[in-house]
Amino acid sequence: MKKNIIRIVIAVLIIGTAAFFILFSKYSEEDEQKYKNSYMSKKELEEDYAFVWDFIENGYPFKNICIRAGADLEKIKKDYLKKLPDIKDELECYLFYMSLLSKIQNNKHIGHLDVYDVYSLNSDTYKVQNTNVYDNDVKVNSFYYLLLMRMNSAIEQNRSEEILKKYDLNLNPPIDLETEDGLESYFETKIIKDKKIAYLDIKSFYTYTNEIKEAYKKRLNSILTSFQDYENLIIDLRENRGGVRRLWQDCIVSPLIKKEQEFCWEVAYNSNNKFTKTFIKDFHSIKLESNRNFHSFSFSSKNKPDKENFDSICGYTKIIKPLQPSINFSGKIWLLIGAVTESAADEFASFSKQTKFANVIGENTSGNGLNSSRFYLKLPNSSLLMQSDILYGLNSDGSCNSEFGTAPDIYNLPGKDALETCLETIKKLGEKTNF
């Protein structure tokens, strides 16, 4: 009797095991079949995906901000894993990760988390530039070369909208600065009241080449010089998403100040984090050392839980010196900011508020101006580059600059925008206008 029971148990185990392996084999075969027309093998795609999420979960210093902004990271991770087999080529790989990183930020801009932008390639060589480590990386540049070819092919075949829709993206290319009209479109000027109030709207601080940068500087200097006899200069950054920080420093502040200005801010970081160590070793141009007492440093109540993710505080000081010869302007400067203002434009707003270079009017910016240098990661199989800030910039009140932005000196008056509020403020200061 016992022998029969043992035989039955063994038979059941054998049949069960065989059934399991048959089902597992069938499932694995079906799973592999999904990747038959994919850009890379299942293993390679999943390795790249895991690499990205390792950074998001263990290195990205703004993860908590994304969660507070409403992003469900676990759901996003599961949802996008299912989409991996749909990636067909370099263009779709690029758009897949652009879409993923946007969703992680709940469609906001938090700490410059993104793919390395194809529009940032060197316009002469079509190679990656300004990354320190990957500018001459053969695999990275090969990926971006093929990406450009795929983009051109999609445009020629009128497939751009279809592919963008597939990855839930709506992209607008940057203004073409390579033509004179393109450069002019970055500036809008008008005289609001002759010899009293001049207005300058700067839509970007981004330039692609040294040649364009020099043309940009020359044009901006010409505009500011033409306004030097005015009592009030209004600089509008409400549509400015940033670019090259040296442009606002060299082209606006230096020509207009009479004595050097000192700008100070702090960043938090985790000195033991593997990604931070890579950043310090390969991407940070100056030695990063904790020079503040971390434990006594107070985070704002709004982002206090984030403090446990860090162990160090570093204070930065930037000194901007007057340009000689300077622009002979002695009037008041007003800086308009809004929710779109970010990155280098946010840094300019923070500088203006701290140093009193300008009276800052509007609403909180989107931030991202106080996080220092960019950090780049190369995906192990595709060689796509992703980027992020690794240092956590802090406002003077201990709040996170990438979450709360820079607050203005004067908020918009009820029912009025920043320009209208600025003009009202000028009136109250005694300016005689006809508005």
Predicted regions and their residues:
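Flexible, low-complexity junctional segments that flank or bridge functional domains
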Residues: N4-V9, L13-Y269, K274, T278-S285, ...
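Conserved acidic, small-residue-rich alpha-beta core segments centered on
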Residues: R246-D417
